[in-house]
Curated annotation (Swiss-Prot):
GO terms for biological process: isopentenyl diphosphate biosynthetic process, methylerythritol 4-phosphate pathway involved in terpenoid biosynthetic process. Pfam families: DXP_redisom_C (PF08436), DXP_reductoisom (PF02670), DXPR_C (PF13288). Pathway: Isoprenoid biosynthesis; isopentenyl diphosphate biosynthesis via DXP pathway; isopentenyl diphosphate from 1-deoxy-D-xylulose 5-phosphate: step 1/6. It comes from the Bacteria. It comes from Bacillus cereus (strain 03BB102). Its EC number is 1.1.1.267. This is 1-deoxy-D-xylulose 5-phosphate reductoisomerase. It catalyses: 2-C-methyl-D-erythritol 4-phosphate + NADP(+) = 1-deoxy-D-xylulose 5-phosphate + NADPH + H(+). Mn(2+) binds at D146, E148, E217. Belongs to the DXR family. NADPH binds at S10, G11, S12, I13, G36, K37, N38, N120, E122, G201.
Length: 380
């Protein structure tokens, strides 16, 4: 029986993580979780899983939950999030929160020698050097939950990582993959939220449409697998059947395939190095699919992917700036305060405005994050 702490239980990854726990009650126990403002959902999860600690975002929601939570301790805010991440009984911490708020809980959980199931891209994007140093220092495993990084991780099982020639990350292309730049001037929030392959939260769905999501994954892959950016390629693959590939020195290429279902990589992170049945996910039927398609990525068409490569290669504090600018811009787009292509413009302005710090401390990263958010808000 593995004890799990889950950060971000009400989001897309969080709800699918609970599906996995539900499928294997003899293998996993939920000891703590966090939610934002979805209190009705939190009540249902408490009643089903009887965790010891639950964290909510707002202090005013604590009393509402305490009235129905029985023996479950209710905490709130950033301190509450840390309490969930550091639960003494938790062996695995699944970080499924969205945004840079996931950084500090990840670092503290690593210091507490918890195994980390990492679904929060922003943690490695903003502070990859700090996270990987901490993981090495405390001998902690970072197990990828993203389908692309899980695919690479599985392809590398038993392989000599020094023999890697390149990583090939696949991209569905998002909601607007078939639209021209001119057509993107007129797209709506509702258009952007209709992803062709995956069911995800609103922020990551917009990131998929701008291709920032893939850019974040490139930076994440750089840190997780220690591969230079020059050896990380992105290929457009509309079917989302091949989740990523690894090419080795001898030009052999290994790929991980499967139907688009996030529960597969989530469960693998929880069961690694073992595997368990996942019977209610669709079995891959290659003759039904028939043909798989691949296209070269156009970084002028998808400018956010170019920004991510530039930020990653520049290094230091630049990825944190790009990430903070993106979070503010995407939120403004979701609120219909800016157009779709303005997201790119705001990110570019923030990156051009920033003076890079080569090896920022945690405090400097948090300061830069806050300053960038203020700068972008002033531009809107």
């Amino acid at each position: 029986m593995k004890n799990i702490s889950l950060l971000g239980a009400s989001g897309s990854i969080g709800t699918q993580t609970l599906d996995v726990l539900r499928s294997h009650p003899d293998q996993f126990r939920l000891v703590a979780f966090s939610v934002g403002k979805n209190i009705d959902y939190a009540v249902k999860v408490i009643q089903e899983f009887s965790p010891q600690i639950v964290s909510v975002q707002r202090e005013e929601d604590v009393l509402k939950l305490q009235a129905v939570s029985g023996n479950t301790k209710i905490v709130y805010g950033s301190e509450g999030l840390l309490e969930v991440a550091l639960h003494p009984d938790a062996e695995i911490v699944v970080n499924a929160v969205v945004g840079s708020v996931g950084l500090l809980p990840t670092l503290r959980a690593i210091e507490a020698k918890k195994t980390i199931g990492i679904a929060n891209k922003e943690t490695l994007v903003t502070a990859g050097h700090l996270v990987m140093e901490a993981a090495r220092k405390h001998n902690v495993s970072l197990l990828p939950v993203d389908s692309e990084h899980s695919a690479i991780f599985q392809c590398l099982n038993g392989e000599n990582e020094k023999r890697i020639s390149r990583l090939i990350i696949t991209a569905s292309g998002g909601s607007f993959r078939d639209k021209t730049r001119d057509e993107l001037h007129h797209v709506t929030v509702e258009d952007a939220l209709r992803h062709p392959n995956w069911s995800m939260g609103s922020k990551i769905t917009i990131d998929s449409a701008t291709m920032m999501n893939k850019g974040l994954e490139v930076i994440e892959a750089h840190w997780l697998f220690g591969i230079p950016y020059e050896q990380i390629d992105v290929v457009l693959h509309k079917e989302s059947i091949i989740h990523s590939m690894v090419e080795f020195e001898d030009r052999s290429v290994m790929a991980q395939l499967g139907s688009p279902d996030m529960r597969v990589p989530i469960q693998y992170a929880l069961t690694y190095p073992d595997r368990l049945p996942l019977s209610d996910t669709k079995q891959l039927n290659l003759w039904e699919i028939g043909t798989l398609h691949f296209e070269k990525m156009n970084q002028e068409r998808f400018r956010c992917l170019r920004f991510a490569y530039e930020a990653g290669k520049t290094g230091g504090s630049m990825p944190a700036v790009m990430n903070a600018a993106n979070e503010v811009a995407v939120e403004a787009f979701l609120q219909k305060r800016i157009g779709f292509l303005t997201v790119e413009d705001l990110i570019e302005k923030a990156m051009n405005h920033h003076n890079v710090i080569a090896r920022p401390s945690l405090e400097e990263i948090l300061e830069i994050d806050a300053a960038t958010r203020r700068f972008v808000m002033e531009q809107i």
